[in-house]
């Protein structure tokens, strides 16, 4: 990679989806029931499978995974928790999906009520903090978030 390519910051991942569910339910499924829709293979637990994903419902709360063996694995922190409109999370997983309390990118999710449905505006930004490989990582993360948001949509529409 040349010097010019290294200076180009990767764009944020931005997604917008329409969910056929009221805003309160869409927010609740995203923030309180992440373990119901998060892909179980997208786990950082080693030696165990994923049982749940928890977002503590307050600014300053934890965002973490619970393994089937009861172990807890940090993913990040809750920066803003404003039901049913906005959720901001600090993603503290490095490009190797290792938790690092000194590392942070930002996941922001905004919920907009429109004609009895909910439009979800998703953004994962500050990806340049991933380092020299950030541009290459962006493609995989973009696809991963697209898949996860599809799973979220299906769960929210089921109720």
Regions found by a protein language model. Name each.
Residues 1-49:
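Hydrophobic ligand-binding cavity/cleft-lining segments
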Residues 7-9, 70-72, 99-103:
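A generic structural micro-feature
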Residues 15-17, 75-80, 104-112:
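Hydrophobic/aromatic beta-strand elements that line small-molecule binding cavities or substrate pockets
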Residues 26-30, 63, 78, 89, ...:
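Hydrophobic pocket/interface hotspot
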Residues 33-73:
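Short beta-edge strand/loop motif at the mouth of beta-sheet-based domains
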Residues 82-87:
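Short, conserved beta-turn/loop elements at beta-strand boundaries and strand-helix junctions
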Residues 92-96, 123-130:
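Short, solvent-exposed aromatic-acidic interface loops
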Residues 119, 126-159:
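A conserved amphipathic terminal alpha-helix motif
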């Amino acid at each position: 990679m040349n010097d010019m390519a290294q200076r180009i910051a990767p764009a944020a991942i931005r997604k917008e989806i329409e969910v056929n569910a009221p805003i309160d339910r869409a927010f609740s499924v995203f923030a309180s029931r992440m373990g119901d829709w998060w892909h179980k293979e997208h786990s950082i637990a080693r030696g165990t499978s994923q049982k749940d994903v928890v977002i503590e419902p307050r600014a300053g709360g934890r965002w973490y995974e619970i393994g089937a063996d009861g172990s807890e694995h940090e993913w990040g922190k809750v920066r803003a928790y404003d039901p049913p409109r906005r959720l901001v999370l600090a993603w503290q997983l490095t490009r190797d999906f290792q938790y690092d309390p000194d590392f942070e990118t930002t996941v922001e999710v905004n919920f907009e009520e429109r004609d009895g449905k909910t439009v979800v505006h998703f953004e994962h930004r500050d990806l340049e903090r991933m380092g020299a490989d950030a541009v290459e990582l962006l493609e995989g993360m973009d696809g991963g978030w697209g898949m996860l948001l599809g799973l979220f949509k299906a769960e929210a529409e089921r109720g």
